[in-house]
Curated annotation (Swiss-Prot):
Keyword Lyase: yes
Repeat listed as a keyword: no
Catalysed reactions listed for this entry: cyanate + hydrogencarbonate + 3 H(+) = NH4(+) + 2 CO2
The entry's keywords: Lyase
GO molecular function, one term: DNA binding
Protein role: Catalyzes the reaction of cyanate with bicarbonate to produce ammonia and carbon dioxide.
Family annotation (Pfam families): Cyanate_lyase, CYNS_N
GO BP terms in the entry: cyanate metabolic process
Catalytic residue positions: 96, 99, 122
Family annotation (CDD domains): Cyanase_C
UniProt source species: Burkholderia thailandensis (strain ATCC 700388 / DSM 13276 / CCUG 48851 / CIP 106301 / E264)
Name recorded for this polypeptide: Cyanate hydratase
Family: Belongs to the cyanase family.
Length: 156
């Protein structure tokens, strides 16, 4: 039976354990994701508390991260989504981007830092592309490309 969380506390605590183990074992999210049958972005978001994992995928990542049966069950629960606190936009279109950042923001940050190092993706030296494409299931889809220059953090 599918279970749902009523607060972020349990998933946040598990996410902290996961990131600590990932760091200690020198694993990448790509390595943790191998064998799940899911995208690395989805699995990363799940490990950071933003999605439930299917049972098989939860067991695969648990084996790599030395997680117990309680953690495997917790990874399968529907989380309280949104990892970035703050004000909420009211425009419906803008809100959807806010929602995307709430769900995937911590995932994007983790994957950018993992692939590029400590730094940011510039919104100044930046390209944005939006394309409308047909959805094979009917209707349309929006393909949005965010292309920003990586800027490393420089110690001083």
């Amino acid at each position: 039976m599918t279970q749902s969380q009523y607060s972020q506390c349990a998933r946040d605590a598990l996410a902290e354990r996961i990131v600590d183990t990932k760091t200690r074992k020198h694993l990448t999210f790509e390595q943790i994701n191998e064998g799940t049958g899911l995208s690395v972005a989805f699995t990363t978001a799940a490990l950071l508390g933003q999605h439930p994992l299917p049972a098989d995928a939860a067991r695969v990542v648990a084996a790599k991260l030395d997680l117990d049966d309680d953690a495997v069950r917790l990874l399968q629960t529907i989380p309280v989504r949104g990892s970035i606190p703050g004000g909420v936009p009211t425009d419906p279109t803008i809100y959807r981007f806010y929602e995307i950042v709430q769900v995937y923001g911590s995932t994007l940050k983790a994957l950018i830092h993992e692939q590029f190092g400590d730094g940011i993706i510039s919104a100044i030296n930046f390209k944005l592309d939006i394309k409308k494409v047909d959805d094979p299931d009917g209707g349309s889809r929006a393909v949005i490309t965010l292309d920003g220059k990586y800027l490393p953090t420089k110690p001083f």
